[in-house]
């Protein structure tokens, strides 16, 4: 089996030379496609669902990562970004938490071709971020760290020398990683410790030591940079507080410290763990996993957050745990990964930021540990 996997990987890499992986290359897109990672402990896969002309979706294919997931049920990774597209949607990265490596796929018409699989540089990779062919991997296990790689034109990863930086301590629960639009700052949320770490990126790709910022709100879980450079952070809220989740925004100062802009704006729901920002930077949506709904906010010019239409803009099936959300590259659709019911919710994004439910894509097991979602 090992030899077979190696031969398959070699074949995929050879094929990738025909269509090089180059940042800025025109993406070869098919119909609207959304990807979900199975995170299966024996054989991790990426499941592709494609939109038909009538607006319905079908399972296009399942693509092996050649690695292993963590297994478990209902959000075992407790992270955002385990499945990540690059900026121009020509490359997809998958974190194999069980086998400790990263798989690189070339995206061709919605289908995926493996171009590389490399050790993550630590234990239990759970989140991946990309900026200009530099790839950052968050390893949450053991002495949690961020490891940086270069992606070459053939879709292969190469570790950057001395470009591993550690989190504030062991077992802090690293749960998300994001890179600023200018590529100069990497932000990591330590879910258990309640910190937001920032790392300055030097010209040679090396990362500074972590600047540790205590979150202004309880339960920081995921952070995403908006196109204007503001950092948007989802907060689950104080323990045992009903519908106590919130969202905050920050400015990153030159010294790596964070200055709050909007502090703990209520999301009117429970367990807000994930957020997704529209490509134009005007709106952010958060996933209230504990109350099966989606809240929306307008992002002001200074980074202030204001609720859209009474805050709750979308609902998922009763009893579902919406694990993660993603927005399509054109900003027209929002996708919600729904645990406990095994669906992907599809919503159309209106110009004013409100959502219209389109459909629920079936086909995922109701009780399984799938994690990660990304959309073309």
Please tell me what each predicted stretch does.
Residues 60-74, 113-119, 160-167, 208-214, ...:
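A short beta-strand motif characteristic of beta-propeller blades
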Residues 136-151, 158-222:
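Aromatic- and glycine-enriched pocket-lining scaffold segments that form the walls
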Residues 39-41, 51, 97, 140-142, ...:
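Short loop/turn segments immediately following the C-termini of beta-strands
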Residues 339-376:
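Blade-level signature of beta-propeller repeat domains, shared across WD40, Kelch, NHL, RCC1
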Residues 27-51:
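An edge-strand/N-cap motif at the start of beta-rich repeat modules
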Residues 48-57, 104-111, 148-157, 198-206, ...:
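Short loop/turn segments immediately following beta-strands, especially the blade-tip
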